[in-house]
Amino acid sequence: MKNIAIILVCALAYCFGVQAQSTIPHSQAGFDVEKAGIAQGKIETVTYNSKTVGTKRKALVYTPPGFSKSKKYPVLYLLHGIGGDELEWFNNGKPQIILDNLYAEGKLTPMIVVLPNGRAIKDDRA
């Protein structure tokens, strides 16, 4: 009886996993290719004091095309994985190109994107 319950749970988990995978939309070809003639956001490097590790850290801040300091924007934080730093997304992805393309296509609300160095070691390489 115990084996039947385990088999049933595994079968159900497999079925739900297959169903979930089939509903994930695919990205359009060229979504991460720089397009000529579209407005581009700006990327700045900022330095901030980290109270957590007691040292200065860097972060990249992307502001959308047409950014105005007088307007309020939502903020998206893109965090790197273990061993990464604030450049991780730019080294292994193209967030600024993807965001610019989505803005140009009218598919995204303008937002500020922050890519911090979230390493928790005071004297690391970053």
Q: Which residue ranges define each predicted feature?
A:
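Short beta-strand element of the alpha/beta-hydrolase
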Residues: 60, 71-83, 113
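A domain-start/cap signature at the N-terminus of enzymes
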Residues: 20-73
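Residue-level signal for beta-strand positions within conserved beta-sheet cores that form or flank
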Residues: 16, 55-57, 109
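Hydrophobic alpha-helical membrane-insertion segments, chiefly the h-region
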Residues: 17-18, 82
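Bacterial N-terminal signal peptides
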Residues: 7-15
